[in-house]
Amino acid sequence: MVHFTAEEKAAITSIWDKVDLEKAGGETLGRLLIVYPWTQRFFEKFGNLSPPQAIMGNPRIRAHGKKVLTSLGLAVQNMDNLKETFAHLSELHCDKLHVDPENFKLLGNMLVIVLSSHLGKEFTAEVQAAWQKLVAAVANALSLKYH
């Protein structure tokens, strides 16, 4: 189990309170699909995923990105209980969707990039470290069903 210090929790929650879920979620998922195009196979039903402008402007991508970040909000609220918090989503992504668990890490890294670009100087190295720790822990929790 990952332990978050009080300072890390404060850094994470202070940033989370400023996140526009639809905007950041859509950009995070869009970047994942553009930077790692093999991930597009999980989203074929979302329509046109080429060129990159089509991905970034796709309302289904934005909506799903918001859904992903809404789920991540559960991590922010339950940092001390990530395994149980994401047990159902781990099972869904493993058994039904067959998502390679490495993609969870890639998505987390895309989120950190988006947060940094949206928040600028407020997203300090210390804040980034806390967020990297959180997204890695969430990726691990989502991967548990695979083991």
UniProtKB/Swiss-Prot annotation:
It comes from the Eukaryota. InterPro entries: Globin (IPR000971), Globin-like_sf (IPR009050), Globin/Proto (IPR012292), Hemoglobin_b (IPR002337), Hemoglobin_oxygen_transport (IPR050056). One of its GO terms (molecular function) is heme binding. GO terms for cellular component: blood microparticle; haptoglobin-hemoglobin complex; hemoglobin complex. Heme b binds at residues 64, 93. This is a minor early embryonic beta chain. One of its GO terms (biological process) is hydrogen peroxide catabolic process. Heterotetramer of two alpha chains and two beta chains. The keyword DNA damage does not apply. Residues 3-147 form the Globin domain. Keywords: Heme, Iron, Metal-binding, Oxygen transport, Transport. Pfam families: Globin (PF00042). It comes from Mesocricetus auratus. Belongs to the globin family. Transmembrane segments: none annotated. This is Hemoglobin subunit beta-Y. Gene3D superfamilies: Globins.
